[in-house]
From Swiss-Prot:
Keywords: Repeat, TPR repeat. Required for formate-dependent nitrite reduction. Not required for the biosynthesis of any of the c-type cytochromes nor for the secretion of the periplasmic cytochromes. PANTHER family: CYTOCHROME C-TYPE BIOGENESIS PROTEIN CCMH, CYTOCHROME C-TYPE BIOGENESIS PROTEIN CYCH. The gene is nrfG. InterPro entries: C-type_cytochrome_biogenesis, TPR-like_helical_dom_sf, TPR_CcmH_CycH, TPR_rpt. PROSITE patterns: TPR, TPR_REGION. Pfam families: TPR_CcmH_CycH (PF23914). This is Formate-dependent nitrite reductase complex subunit NrfG. It comes from the Bacteria. TPR repeats lie at residues 73-106, 144-177. It comes from Escherichia coli O157:H7. GO terms for cellular component: plasma membrane. SMART domains: TPR.
Length: 198
């Protein structure tokens, strides 16, 4: 008895359809999504600099350290910095104030508080922000964060001469905390804008 022959075209079509179904189901699987995400992460030129922890894990780690040693002002300051980077200004202020209470008068902490207040006020210099800067500079006339905040505000207010003077002062300190290239660029930009406004 002769079996019916399946046409070659139909076999080819079924084979191609099966291949597409297999590829399609793989592309829709969570494994493919993970492979694709990792590929994109590897292609990011800054992936080596990215934090290995997600923000929630960083927060949890900081909170655990504080619970273990609640008198550690440095950990409270790091928590304030974490919240600042998350744009959570009220919690940042609370953490920095706790660090200040534990450490006592400290120029860096006053400058950090000024920074939070400045960004909380949408980059406007308020009386409270200025008071924190003044306290920081009274304790350390070369406090970099306070000077940088004053320079940035002067630049935002189109007071380019003052911005240049402050940035130059910061650069002359030769602190490892500063990015000299960025400072030079800021000074050059202020000089350019100053010439245009004259």
């Amino acid at each position: 008895m002769k079996q019916p022959q399946i046409p070659v075209k139909m076999l080819t079509t079924l084979t191609i359809l099966m291949v597409f179904l297999c590829i399609g189901s793989y592309l829709l699987s969570p494994k493919w999504q993970a492979v694709r995400a990792e590929y994109q992460r590897q292609r990011d030129p800054l992936h080596q600099f990215a934090s290995q922890q997600n923000p929630e894990a960083q927060l949890q780690a900081l909170q655990d350290k504080i619970r273990a040693n609640p008198q550690n002002s440095e950990q409270w300051a790091l928590l304030g910095e974490y919240y600042l980077w998350q744009n959570d200004y009220s919690n940042s202020l609370l953490a920095y104030r706790q660090a200040l209470q534990l450490r006592g008068e400290n120029a860096e902490l006053y400058a950090a508080l000024a920074t939070v207040l400045y960004y909380q006020a949408s980059q406007h210099m308020t009386a409270q922000t200025r008071a924190m800067i003044d306290k920081a500079l009274a304790l350390d006339s070369n406090e970099i964060t306070a000077l940088m905040l004053l320079a940035s505000d002067a630049f935002m207010q189109a007071n380019y001469a003052q911005a240049i003077e402050l940035w130059q002062k910061v650069m002359d300190l030769n602190s490892p905390r500063i990015n000299r290239t960025q400072l030079v660029e800021s000074i050059n930009m202020a000089k350019l804008l100053q010439r245009r406004s004259d």
